[in-house]
């Protein structure tokens, strides 16, 4: 009886130690490199990871992560659940929540966030077509009206927006500078252009904008210089891969919009499985990978 009791204590100690100190580990991600896309099948690709527990307090609670951006040792997290943008250090310390409201420096229904690397600023587009500018620490700087309320990226001193017209069913990009506004319509070829009102996301590299839709699973490449769109890669429609928690991943989608999956090899990969989100930001010279668990409010930074 005494031996059984000691064995029980030992097992309990081991279990508690494992749960309290989840610092590093290895996971197998279901990615297999193809010619133009990542195939979602079981593979032996190994990644190491470490945990970033986000500081939890009443004002920092979040869920339904729409976007995670990492810049200058900060994590900028756009939450759909409470319609907010929060700033954490890359060690998980809560820095600030951008105030919600319609006053100066406040945001209402943020649509998208981007980092102005040239001026080292956080920029947030809200529902009322205002671009709110903040320091990297979240202090308000100024507001600027914009031409539309849609996905946007900062290109030097200009902004690029993706929009569509309901009248003629054309998708177009609007480039807004300080003194002029120009529009560039997509190719009218129905085999190339995304259909009307297809949900999309933009991704920016140094010389190119990439965007894709959730309707035809085509990724488009647009040169920043001439805004000429062309199909870049076709995404897979179905998959049967399994995540670290052995739950199935099904269907292709963008970010964490439902229990779906979108894979864009060149710029952004997202696995969303239940409450677990795997997001991999890929540029030519850098790979940033995040694994976010909405149940435990934990962000995992994955190192290749």
PLM regions with names:
Residues 4-12:
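Sec-dependent N-terminal signal peptides
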Residues 16-304:
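Eukaryotic scaffold repeat domains enriched in small/polar residues
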Residues 1-4, 17:
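Positively charged n-region of N-terminal signal peptides that target proteins for export
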């Amino acid at each position: 009886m005494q031996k059984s009791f000691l064995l029980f204590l030992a097992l309990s100690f081991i279990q508690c130690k494992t749960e309290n100190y989840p610092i590093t580990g290895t996971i197998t991600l279901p990615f297999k490199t193809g010619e133009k896309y990542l195939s979602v099948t079981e593979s032996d690709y190994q990644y190491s990871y470490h945990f970033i527990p986000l500081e939890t307090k009443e004002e920092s609670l979040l869920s339904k992560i729409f976007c995670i951006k990492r810049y200058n040792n900060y994590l900028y997290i756009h939450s759909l659940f409470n319609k907010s943008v929060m700033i954490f250090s890359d060690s998980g310390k809560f820095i600030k929540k951008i105030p919600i409201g319609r006053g100066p420096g406040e945001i209402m229904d943020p649509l998208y966030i981007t980092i102005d690397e040239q001026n080292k600023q956080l920029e947030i587009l809200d529902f009322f077509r205002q671009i709110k500018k903040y320091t990297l620490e979240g202090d308000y700087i100024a507001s600027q009206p914009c031409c539309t309320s849609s996905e946007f990226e900062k290109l030097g001193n200009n902004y690029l927006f993706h929009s569509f017209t309901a009248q003629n069913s054309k998708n177009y990009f609007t480039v807004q500078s300080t003194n002029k506004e120009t529009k560039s319509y997509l190719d009218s070829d129905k085999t190339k252009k995304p259909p009307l009102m297809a949900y999309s996301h933009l991704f920016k590299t140094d010389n190119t904008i990439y965007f894709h839709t959730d309707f035809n699973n085509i990724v488009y490449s647009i040169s920043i210089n001439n805004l000429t769109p062309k199909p870049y890669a076709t995404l897979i429609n179905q998959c049967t891969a399994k995540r670290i928690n052995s739950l199935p991943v099904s269907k292709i989608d963008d970010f964490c919009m439902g229990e779906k999956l979108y894979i864009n090899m060149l710029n952004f990969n997202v696995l969303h499985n239940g409450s677990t989100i795997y997001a991999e930001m890929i540029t030519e010279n850098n790979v940033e990978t995040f694994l976010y668990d909405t149940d435990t409010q934990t962000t995992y930074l994955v190192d290749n």
